[in-house]
């Protein structure tokens, strides 16, 4: 039984490419590298991992080099160093360190959910290797972080203590809970297959060191980080920016994206029949949108 748990925690869809590892100042980061061409680095949010992009990468890998890291946000397999900075500033630094370590240039940084919040910090403070920025159904200056819709603020509250954090996550052992609005039900419009969900929830349920990383990360988030980043971006970010937004998003309202796109001078495209995880709900539309935008 335990070996099966390990398999579920470490399983990544083979369409992402072979898993690789890179040593960064914060610790070892596992990532996948698939395709060739202009580089897209995909940044996921809390309690998911590279599997979020499993449907999208094979639709892009014929024309783009797709880098999909597992960030230390609770669904990863390699624990960070105990003293690693996993505040929003620290996660942004980790992403920047990843781009440096892989010597990636003119990167399109694609952030979804709280990955979009971290991507804004990267663009504000570490833009040297960026060529373009895609923000997809994520925090804006009007959002709280964690977002209030869906009750995700409870994640930060319970992160204050290891036992409260452990107790909160126990409900994820029940498959029916995965469709609740305060777990994944308002993030993916349709159910996610159990193997993928196992890779999302098993690490934080079974491994205290992974739960420790997740607690550090979610316990440190605050809207003050995204608002400061937004101020810097609206004041002068000279790369193309796209907001790719789920038209029916329950967590990050499309109206927020409309106002943020105007402030950034960015293009906004709405994706129908999708919640926050557009790469999960609408991979074909998302791939077509990216291809078209890159050609414009």
Question: Which residues make up each language-model segment?
Answer:
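Short, flexible hinge/linker loops that cap or flank conserved catalytic cores
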Residues: 23-25, 33-35, 40, 235-236
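Conserved beta-strand termini and adjacent loop/short-helix elements that scaffold enzyme active sites
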Residues: 25, 34, 69, 271-273
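Residue-level signal for the nucleotide or nucleotide-sugar donor/cofactor binding architecture
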Residues: 48, 55, 86, 90, ...
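Conserved acidic functional residues
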Residues: 45, 113, 280-281
């Amino acid at each position: 039984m335990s070996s099966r748990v390990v398999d579920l925690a470490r399983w990544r869809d083979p369409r992402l490419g072979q898993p690789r590892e890179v040593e960064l100042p914060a610790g070892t980061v596992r990532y996948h590298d698939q395709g060739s061409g202009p580089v897209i680095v995909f940044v996921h949010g809390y309690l998911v991992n590279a599997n979020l992009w499993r449907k999208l990468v094979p639709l892009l890998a014929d024309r783009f080099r797709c880098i999909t890291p597992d960030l230390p946000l609770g669904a990863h397999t390699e624990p960070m160093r105990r003293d690693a900075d996993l505040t929003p500033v620290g996660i942004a630094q980790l992403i920047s360190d990843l781009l440096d370590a892989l010597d990636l240039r003119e990167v399109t940084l694609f952030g979804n959910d709280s990955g979009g919040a971290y991507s804004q910090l990267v663009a504000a403070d570490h833009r040297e290797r960026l060529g373009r920025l895609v923000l997809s159904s994520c925090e804006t200056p009007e959002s709280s972080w964690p977002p209030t819709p869906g009750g995700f603020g409870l994640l930060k509250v319970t992160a204050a203590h290891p036992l409260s954090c452990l107790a909160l996550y126990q409900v994820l052992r029940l498959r029916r809970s995965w469709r609740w609005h305060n777990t994944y039900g308002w993030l993916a419009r349709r159910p996610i297959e159990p193997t993928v969900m196992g890779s999302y929830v098993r690490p934080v349920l079974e491994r205290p060191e992974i739960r420790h990383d997740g607690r550090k990360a979610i316990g440190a988030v605050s809207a003050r980080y995204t608002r400061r980043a937004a101020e810097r971006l609206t004041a002068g970010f000279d790369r193309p920016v796209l907001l790719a937004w789920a038209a029916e998003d329950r967590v990050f309202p499309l109206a927020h994206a409309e106002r943020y796109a105007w402030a950034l001078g960015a293009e906004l495209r709405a994706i129908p029949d999708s919640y926050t995880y557009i790469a999960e709900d609408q991979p074909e539309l998302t791939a077509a949108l990216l291809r078209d935008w890159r050609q414009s």
